[in-house]
């Protein structure tokens, strides 16, 4: 494995691996340790005290971050008729039906970041389950991406709506914004995300819900947050 660069090693010295920081301190450090030549993304990784193997302990949803993510999101919408026109007016990047299914299947085309569909188009979208599912792109009612209100869906996504869901190790991974953001913007995005995740706690979850929280920039070290201080 290649050694990390000099800048990374210098950044690492700023972080006390034995310490659990409060959110403001952690995000300040994430900004300081973002030393790459590009504008790194600051991410949150939240381990929950649930078991994703059980249906009644799933944690999944979406939340609009007040300051967005800093990323330009490309939206594909499956809709027809007046709903297709609505999606185009709202600013969707691609709108269609069977022809988009054929393009994805035939050309392995994935030049989009989010897929939205009206409920009546899910039969069409279902044919893409095997390719969209593993990429986390399958529309889902819980995340607001299966809906007839396409104007709201597209506007929220463009404004900074992010999805969160458990991976196999019961961790949620969500972008909080860019390292160039003001510290206050990243903190507000973080608190908005945490609030949504806490509210999504399954009734079947027992014991400590927020097990561990780490923030990091794309190329930077992980900075641990004290899960007992996050909502202070």
Curated annotation (Swiss-Prot):
One of its GO terms (cellular component) is large ribosomal subunit. GO terms for molecular function: rRNA binding; structural constituent of ribosome; tRNA binding. The keyword Transferase does not apply. InterPro entries: Ribosom_uL1_bac-type, Ribosomal_uL1, Ribosomal_uL1-like, Ribosomal_uL1/biogenesis, Ribosomal_uL1_3-a/b-sand, Ribosomal_uL1_CS. The keyword Cell cycle does not apply. SUPFAM superfamilies: Ribosomal protein L1 (SSF56808). It holds the Pfam family Ribosomal_L1. CDD domains: Ribosomal_L1. Keywords: Repressor, Ribonucleoprotein, Ribosomal protein, RNA-binding, rRNA-binding, Translation regulation, tRNA-binding. Gene3D superfamilies: 3.30.190.20, 3.40.50.790. One of its GO terms (biological process) is regulation of translation. It comes from the Bacteria. Part of the 50S ribosomal subunit. NCBIfam families: rplA_bact. Binds directly to 23S rRNA. The L1 stalk is quite mobile in the ribosome, and is involved in E site tRNA release. Belongs to the universal ribosomal protein uL1 family. This is Large ribosomal subunit protein uL1. The lineage of its organism: Bacteria, Bacillati, Bacillota, Clostridia, Peptostreptococcales. The gene is rplA.
């Amino acid at each position: 494995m290649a050694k990390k660069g000099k800048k990374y090693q210098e950044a690492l010295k700023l972080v006390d691996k034995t310490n659990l920081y409060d959110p403001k301190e952690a995000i300040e450090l994430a900004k300081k340790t973002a030393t790459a030549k590009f504008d790194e993304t600051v991410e949150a990784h939240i381990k929950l005290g649930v078991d994703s193997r059980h249906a009644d302990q799933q944690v999944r949803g979406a939340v609009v971050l007040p300051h967005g993510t800093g990323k330009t999101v490309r939206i594909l919408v499956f809709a027809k008729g007046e709903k297709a026109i609505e999606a185009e007016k709202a600013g969707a990047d691609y709108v269609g039906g069977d022809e988009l299914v054929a393009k994805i299947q035939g050309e392995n085309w994935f030049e989009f970041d989010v897929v939205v569909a009206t409920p009546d188009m899910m039969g069409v979208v279902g044919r893409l389950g095997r390719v969209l599912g593993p990429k986390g792109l399958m529309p889902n009612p819980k995340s607001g991406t299966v809906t007839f209100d396409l104007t709201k869906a597209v506007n929220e996504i463009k404004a900074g709506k992010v999805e969160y869901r458990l991976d196999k190790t019961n961790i949620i991974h969500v972008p909080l914004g860019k390292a160039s953001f003001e510290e206050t913007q990243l903190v507000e995005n973080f608190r908005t995300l945490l609030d949504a995740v806490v509210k999504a706690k399954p009734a079947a979850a027992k014991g400590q819900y927020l097990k561990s929280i780490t923030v990091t920039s794309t190329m930077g070290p992980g900075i641990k947050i004290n899960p007992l201080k996050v909502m202070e």
